[in-house]
A protein has these predicted regions:
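Short glycine/acidic-enriched loop and turn motifs that connect beta-strands
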Residues: 18-21, 68-71, 116-118, 163-166, ...
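Blade-level signature of beta-propeller repeat domains, shared across WD40, Kelch, NHL, RCC1
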Residues: 121, 366-395
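Predominantly five- to eight-bladed beta-propeller fold
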Residues: 76-85, 320, 331, 387-395
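Short, solvent-exposed loop/turn segments that connect beta-strands within catalytic domains
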Residues: 20-22, 32-37, 71, 82-87, ...
Length: 395
């Protein structure tokens, strides 16, 4: 993707995606036709992934932006000259933080788009009427905070944040104070932390080793255990209520389905047959999940041990933006437009759906229900946008 031909027409530079967050620059020689001449040569590593690329006016170098998934990106310059033995080292530039698209004129003027986004965790006391979500003041980061989860005693939070420059797992007190980074995976994606029912471990997914695998972390000791090692992409994992099983989404069959594996390790068992992800076990023996192929924006239900799949409610904003309570489902719903979401509740026994609160900010990734259903955590976008930046007389 993002093909750009060198000023002299001899090379085509392009980006090749291996998986989310892992993107590298490749160079392909061209004939005067133009037509491919030879095989593409990889010019950069794919971790951190490349976002945008442009040729310098003299055609000797490429300028690009790279960074982890949702994390901090930087601009760099790398030689396009053939290398006899090793990949050239990029030279990081003094400008271009959060750059995406890059363009360089023949006169040497460079322009790029600098994007920004600040998402934060908001807590909503339950019952919600007529309250509104309140930001956790201790979260002072200007980067992303997302996919939150309460500890079993409700006193601590686990969440993903890009405040260190790459997406990592953090823990904090319930009010957001004393945040502590507990992973150092280095990108490109590290997300969806879930406390174990006994509070001793945190389950999460990371793409550090490729397409996506599940990991267990003991935050008190820092011990990290890799649970899955499969070419497929696996994530959005949740514990069973007794802590003996782990439910997760995997595309190992060719599409996303819900699978279950022993928490202590062992072969997984496929649960859904028509698409699924982000499964949560209820107290009455069902799994509630999203991403069914017949209706991806709906929440579905299937017995824990497998059986008939039933659509429960429509309008889910994103696959992990729901929680299962004792009486029903809390979920971030899409309003008339995507920028007008609401927090809704669906009573499973009566089939009644109600809106708890209209959200005045765009939704982001993840939500969590506190023990005892005293409150909900949401990730909402405080600000987002982009600016065009001009660099004169480059390089």
């Amino acid at each position: 993707m993002s093909p750009v031909v060198s000023p002299d027409g001899r090379y085509l530079a392009f980006l090749r995606v291996r998986t989310v967050g892992r993107v590298a620059i490749f160079l392909l020689p061209l004939t005067s036709g133009p037509a491919p001449s030879g095989t593409p040569r990889q010019l950069t590593d794919d971790d951190p992934g490349v976002i945008g690329v442009a040729w310098t006016a003299d055609g000797r170098d490429l300028v690009f932006s790279s960074g982890g998934h949702l994390g901090l990106s930087r601009t760099a310059k790398i030689s396009a000259a053939p290398q006899s033995s090793r990949t050239p080292e990029p030279e990081f530039l003094t400008f271009g933080e959060q750059a995406t698209a890059i363009s360089i004129a023949g006169t040497g003027r460079l322009v790029y788009s600098a994007q920004f986004r600040d998402s934060a965790l908001y807590e909503l006391a339950l019952p919600a009427r007529p309250a509104t979500p309140v930001a956790l003041a201790a979260f002072s980061s200007t980067f992303d905070e997302q996919t939150p989860h309460y500890s079993p005693d409700g006193q601590r939070l686990a969440f993903a944040s890009t405040r260190s420059g790459t997406e990592e797992i953090w823990i904090a007190n319930r009010d957001g104070s004393k945040p502590l980074q507990v992973t150092s995976m280095g990108g490109p994606q590290c997300s969806n932390p879930q406390w174990s029912p006994d509070g001793s471990e945190i389950l999460f997914n990371s793409r550090r080793a490729g397409s996506g695998d599940l990991y267990l972390l003991r935050p008190e000791t820092g011990k990290l255990t890799r649970l899955t090692d499969h070419p497929a992409s696996e994530g959005e994992a949740r514990w069973s209520r007794d802590g003996r099983w782990i439910y997760f989404g995997s595309n190992r069959t060719g599409r996303d389905e819900v699978w279950r594996m022993p928490a202590a390790g062992g072969p997984p068992i496929q649960i859904t047959r028509n698409g699924g992800a982000a499964a949560i076990e209820s107290g009455d023996g069902f799994l509630y999940y999203s991403n069914h192929t017949a209706s991806p924006s709906s929440i579905w239900r299937v017995p824990v041990d497998g059986g008939s799949e039933v659509r429960i409610v429509d309008g889910l904003s994103y696959s992990i933006n729901f929680a299962v309570g004792e009486r029903g489902l809390y979920f971030v719903a899409i309003g008339d437009t995507a920028d007008k979401p609401s927090l809704d509740f669906f009573d499973v026994a009566t089939g009644q759906r109600s809106t708890l609160v209209r959200l005045d900010k765009p939704f982001w990734f993840g939500m969590a229900l506190a023990p005892g259903e005293r409150s909900l955590l949401l990730s909402l976008v405080d600000s987002a946008g982009s600016n065009l930046m001009l660099v004169d007389r480059f390089p």
